[in-house]
Amino acid sequence: MNRTDELRTARIESLVTPAELALRYPVTPGVATHVTDSRRRIEKILNGEDKRLLVIIGPCSIHDLTAAMEYATRLQSLRNQYQSRLEIVMRTYFEKPRTVVGWKGLISDPDLNGSYRVNHGLELARKLLLQVNELGVPTATEFLDMVTGQFIADLISWGAIGARTTESQIHREMASALSCPVGFKNGTDGNTRIAVDAIRAARASHMFLSPDKNGQMTIYQTSGNPYGHIIMRGGKKPNYHADDIAAACDTLHEFDLPEHLVVDFSHGNCQKQHRRQLEVCEDICQQIRNGSTAIAGIMAESFLREGTQKIVGGQPLTYGQSITDPCLGWEDTERLVEKLASAVDTRF
């Protein structure tokens, strides 16, 4: 009989289960309390109960655990310095959506060479998240793959659904199940309505099919996530200006949703010129000083060293520099955070 299935499958390998990985890298009581408390603080900011600003900042993607931990240690110092004005959360992105092809992140390809040692990538990701949370720094990530979240979601304080997946039904259903607040980016064309629709969908109960922590295929029924919000990330043109934010809030108001959002300084808002994140910061700070309460948080891409680099076989990588989108360096990061804290002073 002719085969009719898996005709294009090149490789199948056993995957560790989320339960097995959690046994190897368990959540400690201290980390569990830290994650729970961090989520609650973020929820209060998104609801307008806390006047502080949510600051989600870090490398475009994680590829080097040593550099990531050095960044986290420095970020913890900034958290301590500005905790009365800012809720600083580290961007820990392990999955990268690609427009066509490219490196898809630490979990998929931890060795950066196309070997796809996913089990090792999952171990590295969970290990790093535990270490960063143990420092006292909350973590944020994008939930891209429908299975990967099962391995790390218990260590995440804030999640994102990206511009390419906000319109996806299954991602909206997944967001309705997540235990952390979830931001939905506007579409790559700048369309914010799809993010509003995603927020509405994620608030509802859904049923979807998914493996559980033990790898058993199950039917999941969710209760809905009340902490969805828009991430203004720009599109063909920036959308961080006051009139753009007002228009987004009008749409939120139309559907009786909280008029609080997050502004992404990078991506379409900086028109892929990483130093323009500083210009976006200046504009957002002025809006805050002018009395804007809609801006609940910001996102920015920064690392130890400015810019980006390409992966070249046989050549060492520059320590602390991005291998995906270009990032601000550490000195600019300190200046950016200081400016945000100063602007938020006017809310008190």
Curated annotation (Swiss-Prot):
The keyword Protease does not apply. This is Phospho-2-dehydro-3-deoxyheptonate aldolase, Trp-sensitive. It catalyses: D-erythrose 4-phosphate + phosphoenolpyruvate + H2O = 7-phospho-2-dehydro-3-deoxy-D-arabino-heptonate + phosphate. Its EC number is 2.5.1.54. Stereospecific condensation of phosphoenolpyruvate (PEP) and D-erythrose-4-phosphate (E4P) giving rise to 3-deoxy-D-arabino-heptulosonate-7-phosphate (DAHP). GO terms for biological process: amino acid biosynthetic process; aromatic amino acid family biosynthetic process; chorismate biosynthetic process. GO terms for molecular function: 3-deoxy-7-phosphoheptulonate synthase activity. It comes from Escherichia coli O6:H1 (strain CFT073 / ATCC 700928 / UPEC). InterPro entries: Aldolase_TIM, DAHP1/KDSA, DAHP_synth_1. Keywords: Amino-acid biosynthesis, Aromatic amino acid biosynthesis, Transferase. It comes from the Bacteria.
